Amino acid sequence: MARLSRERYAQLYGPTTGDRIRLADTDLLVEITEDRCGGPGLAGDEAVFGGGKVLRESMGQGRVTRAEGAPDTVITGAVIIDYWGIIKANIGIRDGRIVAIGKAGNPNIMSGIHPDLVVGPSTEIIGGNGRIVTAGAIDCHVHLICPQVIAEALSSGITTIIGGGTGPAEGSKSTTVTPGGWHLARMLEALDSWPVNIALLGKGNTVNPDALWEQLRGGASGFKLHEDWGKSPAAIDACLTVADAAGVQVALHSDTLNEMGFVEDTLAAIAGRSIHTYHTEGAGGGHAPDIITVAAHPNVLPSSTNPTRPHTVNALDEHLDMLMVCHHLNPRIPDDLAFAESRIRPSTIAAEDLLHDIGAISMIGSDSQAMGRVGEVVMRTWQTAHVMKQRRGALEGDPSGRYSADNNRARRYVAKYTICPAVAHGLDHEVGSVEVGKLADLVLWEPAFFGVRPHAVVKGGAIAWAAMGDANASIPTPQPVLPRPMFGASPAVAAATSVHFVAAQSIEAGLADQIAVDRRLVPVADVRAVGKADMPLNDAQPRIEVDPDTFTVRIDGEVWEQQPATELPMAQRYFLF
């Protein structure tokens, strides 16, 4: 009996169980733990499309009709990297949702075919062989300052946006808030034609509960409390009281100046209630110098933003200028300069690296155009993982050695921009992972470009964005190959394949009949019982201490020394600028 070498098998069908894949130009490797497509010993029985290949009439393609259950699309032979594991499988999509993860083909001539992956004449094929698939990324911290940020987000693999804004207004440039029913309605209408899911945050800075409830009825999915609007303990309590009654999440950017209390006062106002703390880091804002300590608390769902990911030799200089612009400060005013310098602390930026690696900071967002870059959430997450492997070695549970697999680290880091923000904001019943029943928001990557530029972005089952060559060429691949909108990005299709996440009170108030949107309005799940323990693979609660004079950080009693990176992967090797 003829046998295939592993190398030849990978060339024909893609890697299989036991094979390791390098992620872009990082030091990170992942190993396939299961192959649901076939694998060695079953070679020739895999679903592969092309001339002379398997998925042809009366061969790998059967006669089953769509009415009889054939999937609309099958992604063949993809390596799935998700929080729950790293496997190879075919992915079936029907009506914009994932219906099966297993083996696809024609059960009349092939063994082990999943009943929901029977390929028929109505089935389209996306070739995933030799490619990686991840869940569409969720950016949990987006300032909607201009519509172009959405194109940039899609180009990097983001399919869900949590945040707020109304355009280039001063409030939006600073605070991630869409305030009030009129602005919420207009933004939901404006975003209806983009192939991304949207969850807008209303303004939480008030002690008037009526002002909060009207925003929930008007389309907000939750609230944002920001220091630039005045973050008093009373406002925190009032906002969380309404959130508890409504079941929605509150995102908090706390008080850098400590005007209205210190971190202990903010924690007292939160009073053990679930809260998503933005900028649980060393530079983005919040109580100086010790906001990072909130990551130790069981009710706090901490995130940080990508401009400090990872700690590099350029971080300090870059942030000072960014802060001056984003928060309307004047470098010629001593008080403004002191504010900026107190907010940017190399020691806490460095500690942020470690807290991500041990799973104490659970999420990463962009803070787009407000000190962060919307197109770099995925990339900077994996740069951080690379730097931490270089510095700390293998993560607990991963084998040691230069060429050993980093599956546990990969699963932890991919969760930071997929399932963790979905759970935190009550979206995980629809998005956040590659699992049956969820929207088919999927990103395909060539391994050499993993985390840098997607091969294709599938939104609700339709290809919305892809790396595409010259449209006047004779084939799709001639240069320049650029991320470009596809048919799935047309307004009608985008509305059919994407959702607006809103509070349940919006649905009850009949919002869908009051605004000009074509997509579904989906209520967020009740998140008020969600705590740190619910953050998959990112639930650590170490003891964190910050010296108020030197800003030295101790994590479980150990000082974390600053070692800013001088060189990163996924950088100039891929980009001119």
Curated annotation (Swiss-Prot):
This protein's name: Urease subunit alpha
Keyword Metal-binding belongs to the record: yes
Please tell me which top-level EC class this enzyme sits in: hydrolase
Residues where Ni(2+) 2 binds? 224, 253, 279
Catalytic activities: urea + 2 H2O + H(+) = hydrogencarbonate + 2 NH4(+)
Where is the protein situated, by its record's location annotation?
Answer: Cytoplasm
Example of a GO biological process term? urea catabolic process
